[in-house]
């Protein structure tokens, strides 16, 4: 969500963990200058607000990561800049303009279905359209594991049942179809799902049950990779 807004704005939401992205990065042993690429899965404020900050004089906004390319896609960027009434309050100009005007914005090439390798980033991305137009779901290989950043396709473990979609979804029936196909592939290919909105389950694996796909195991990032 970032730190640009006033406390009244933040009072409407429950923030979990470190509120400051900079301190979180520092705890991991890095600095903002080390970041080379930022992938915006989509441009709702809770997914991109931390990518830009006030300058020291609080006279203008600037990208937080001065050495990074910020990745979106052309369709979703246009969707956010000309928003529909349902999503308008989630697409904030102060999150978009600093990235675009700084020259840091780059677009990923688009495709229709499934995960495909993106030469620009050397990882795979899937596009989904139920939550918002052309949301990007990244998949990476790390330490012999396949990790998928589930973004708002599956925000929490409570959203694993196919009918349980977010109230924010612009096309809930599309979301259900996208989620069902993804979950089946996730079980088949033993994906590790990183859940952005789940305060209690950071990374999960999945299994088939008589009620559908459900959580198999739950890990913190440190448990899995340290």
Indicate residue ranges for each PLM-predicted region.
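Active-site metal-binding loops of divalent metal-dependent hydrolases
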Residues: 1-3, 43, 75-76, 130-132, ...
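Metal-dependent catalytic neighborhoods of phosphoester/phosphodiester hydrolases
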Residues: 49-60, 205-206
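Short acidic/His/Gly/Ser-rich catalytic and metal-binding motifs that mark active-site loops
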Residues: 3-7, 79-81, 156-161
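Metallo-beta-lactamase
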Residues: 16-19, 24-30, 34-46, 64-127, ...
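Conserved beta-strand hairpin/beta-sheet module of binuclear metal-dependent hydrolase folds
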Residues: 1-23, 27, 137-152
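Active-site glycine- and acidic-residue-rich loops that bind
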Residues: 48-52, 124-136
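Accessory terminal helices/loops
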Residues: 113-115, 120-123, 140, 144-145, ...
